[in-house]
UniProtKB/Swiss-Prot annotation:
InterPro entries: Ribosomal_uL14, Ribosomal_uL14_bac-type, Ribosomal_uL14_CS, Ribosomal_uL14_sf. Keywords: Ribonucleoprotein, Ribosomal protein, RNA-binding, rRNA-binding. This is Large ribosomal subunit protein uL14. Belongs to the universal ribosomal protein uL14 family. The gene is rplN. SMART domains: Ribosomal_L14. One of its GO terms (molecular function) is large ribosomal subunit rRNA binding. Part of the 50S ribosomal subunit. Forms a cluster with proteins L3 and L19. In the 70S ribosome, L14 and L19 interact and together make contacts with the 16S rRNA in bridges B5 and B8. CDD domains: Ribosomal_uL14.
Length: 130
């Protein structure tokens, strides 16, 4: 559950290290963002010579949350941190690498470029008897 003033880690190599959510996109009074939601954020910490600078306002998609997500099969998925990937105007990632696992819900939000760059897609496999 991401809301205004929530600080998130950045899971790509765009140059930003930490961002702060300004607004959750997708409705006039949408309060919370979950995995796969697009937010408007401000860069709070950045490395020198990065693609984005400190204080810059960017759009980002949430890829991990501490708040658990309930899947259709009944399982709950949660992560150790809140993380996002910074997007450009065409909703493609600014960075060329993604760090850490990415939740499967990002695929349902049609961010296929992020899925293809992710080193690990958190995809729970249930034990099924044959």
């Amino acid at each position: 559950m991401i809301q205004s003033f929530t600080r998130l880690n950045v899971a790509d190599n765009s140059g930003a290290k930490e961002i702060m959510c300004i607004k959750v996109l997708g409705g006039s009074h949408k309060r919370y963002a979950s995995v796969g939601s697009v937010i408007v954020a401000s860069v709070k910490k950045a490395i020198p010579n990065g693609k984005v600078k400190r204080g810059q306002v960017v759009k980002a998609v949430v890829v991990r949350t501490k708040k658990e997500i309930q899947r259709k099969n009944g399982s709950l998925v949660r992560f150790d941190d809140n993380a996002a990937v910074i997007l450009d105007a065409k909703k493609d990632p600014v960075g060329t690498r993604i760090f850490g696992p990415v939740s499967r819900e990002v695929r349902y939000a049609n961010f296929m470029k992020i899925i293809s760059l992710a080193p690990e897609l958190y995809n729970e496999k249930r034990n099924q008897k044959k």
